[in-house]
Amino acid sequence: MLLELARWLQQLESLFGLFNYLTFRGILAALTALFLSLWMGPAVIRKLAQFKGGQPIRQDGPQTHFSKAGTPTMGGSLILLTVTLSVLLWGDLRNRYVWLVLAVMICFGAIGWYDDWIKIVRRDPNGLKSRWKYLLQSIFGLAAGLFLYYTADVPAAITFYIPMFKAIALPLAGVSFVVIAYFWIVGFSNAVNLTDGLDGLAIMPTVLVACALGVFAYASGNVVFAEYLKIPLIPGAGELIIICSAIAGAGLGFLWFNTYPAMVFMGDIGALSLGAVLGTVAVIVRQELVLVIMGGVFVIETLSVMIQVASFKLTGKRVFRMAPIHHHFELKGWPEPRVIVRFWIISVVLVLIGLATLKVR
């Protein structure tokens, strides 16, 4: 019987060989995360609803948002769970980048979980005090930057590149590299969090950007593609396509429940962690500026808040009716679904522009 089993397995050698292909495992990671999200989603939402404390609604926000009171939050826990399970199942667990990105996701997710918990228990829309939130984010962001710098095994891994000007390469010293890594990880963590103010607004751009970063990761880890496209070759970076694919699958699964009108909100546990992951992957594959392009919706949302605060402090006047800017359009009379879909369209265009930089030289 064992001989027959051995012969049968030998016939399946070509099938098992498929698992050596990153693209194949990436597809499986996405599908696994997607189906896990769809399967576990209803149970997770019911569990979150038992807290009897949905996302607190801003009293100065659009009147239409008061109908959202009581909607369960912390739905990002579903994303983190399904992404982690999918990556552990399909990822190469010998790859240091896989463990780093998972660690960043979990650490920033823990900050978001505590922030959400305060909002629910204390009914405080502000959640965790900003200084403590930024302190924890800074600790984890700096730790990730230091890890990447001291484990870099090729000069390209600590060199700053400018898209479309691929002959320009700026070697980074320790401090400058860590500072850039810190700002991108912490910055995009907060940028995604600011964007997460309407049903499905943040998760779809996150899915799109994750897919594009997966393409960059795959190309950066492949000698042939990296040379042909004139992008930095980062050994081991290709494995990040598994994480990016898992995020895309989990994000689509979450969107099934988060689309307007939302059955559950992502909460800070999802927004902070996903933004940090996008920033970390961009730093690893040396595509920081491309992330600024592809994640333009997140950047615009963040800039709108900065402009609003600066204008009010300097002149006492507001530039926008309300910040982040998606609320400005709501107060102008745009229905929420219109704001959401138009921001999605902008994200699609920006992601395509970012992908085009692969060929533009």
Swiss-Prot record:
Alphabetical keyword list: Cell cycle, Cell division, Cell inner membrane, Cell membrane, Cell shape, Cell wall biogenesis/degradation, Magnesium, Membrane, Metal-binding, Peptidoglycan synthesis, Transferase, Transmembrane, Transmembrane helix
Predominant location category: membrane
Pfam families: Glycos_transf_4
Catalytic activity: UDP-N-acetyl-alpha-D-muramoyl-L-alanyl-gamma-D-glutamyl-meso-2,6-diaminopimeloyl-D-alanyl-D-alanine + di-trans,octa-cis-undecaprenyl phosphate = di-trans,octa-cis-undecaprenyl diphospho-N-acetyl-alpha-D-muramoyl-L-alanyl-D-glutamyl-meso-2,6-diaminopimeloyl-D-alanyl-D-alanine + UMP
Pathway per the UniProt entry: Cell wall biogenesis; peptidoglycan biosynthesis
Function of the molecule: Catalyzes the initial step of the lipid cycle reactions in the biosynthesis of the cell wall peptidoglycan: transfers peptidoglycan precursor phospho-MurNAc-pentapeptide from UDP-MurNAc-pentapeptide onto the lipid carrier undecaprenyl phosphate, yielding undecaprenyl-pyrophosphoryl-MurNAc-pentapeptide, known as lipid I.
Family: Belongs to the glycosyltransferase 4 family. MraY subfamily.
Name the record gives this protein: Phospho-N-acetylmuramoyl-pentapeptide-transferase
